[in-house]
Amino acid sequence: MDIKHHTSTSKPKNKNKLLKMLPKAMSFGHRVPPFSPGRDLHHNNHHNYTAANKMFFSGPMVPLVPNAARVRRNKSDAVWDEPTSPKVSCIGQIKLGKSKCPTGKKNKAPSSLIPKISKTSTSSLTKEDEKGRLSKIKSIFSFSPASGRNTSRKSHPTAVSAADEHPVTVVSTAAVPSLGQMKKFASSRDALGDFDWAVEMKHEEESPADHHRGYYSDDDTRGAYLRYDDDEDEDDIIIPFSAPLGLKPKKEVNLWKRRTMDPPKPLHLQTI
């Protein structure tokens, strides 16, 4: 027992001697790579922790909002999700999440608001519509200009009653203009379609009162419609105004009088 006790007490003494022999400025250390949360925490969080990781991070990653608070018990409860960056397209627009409710269901009206029509009422309506259509076809072929409206209403009272009850099914019997007539009135190209120039020229030749006005075309000669004086070059100028016109001479304004500098000297051309 004494030997064992002696050996156990001699080991710490030897360690102390070695430490005393070392210089005080010298120290031991080991190089540790820089901490990377994506590398160290993601890969080593669920498996094992190294000594280097324990030095920098001592506990697991805990979210700010606990998982129990994220569960909604009712639909009216708010969702406390952690804020994240939105998804952005290549243009720069924020991508919104898809709507849970499709658009087709919103447009559909509830079945309680749609009135239900019995089968007996629908069958009676269809029979009245058929009778009204047949009576209208007969009235079109048996239409007289003198008493067209009165006879059609008296002879077919069912059509009138059907028109009063269901005004949507009434079709006007007035003649619809054709496409050619609509195009004719849409533009003014056919306004002078029946105009005859030969007839108008005859009327001008027969009326001597218009000869002195000087109306002529490019193809006609001016001598037939104009009065010439002794000189052939001078034409009669007709002014359609009774009172005399007061013509004033133009006033030439000397702009150099308004300027402070002297006007330039006129150019003199020397003949060689």
Curated annotation (Swiss-Prot):
Residues 110-125 have a biased composition (Low complexity). It comes from the Eukaryota. This is Uncharacterized protein At1g76070. InterPro entries: At1g76070-like. Keywords: Phosphoprotein. The modification Phosphoserine is found at residue 142. It comes from Arabidopsis thaliana (Mouse-ear cress). Residues 101-130 are annotated as: Disordered.
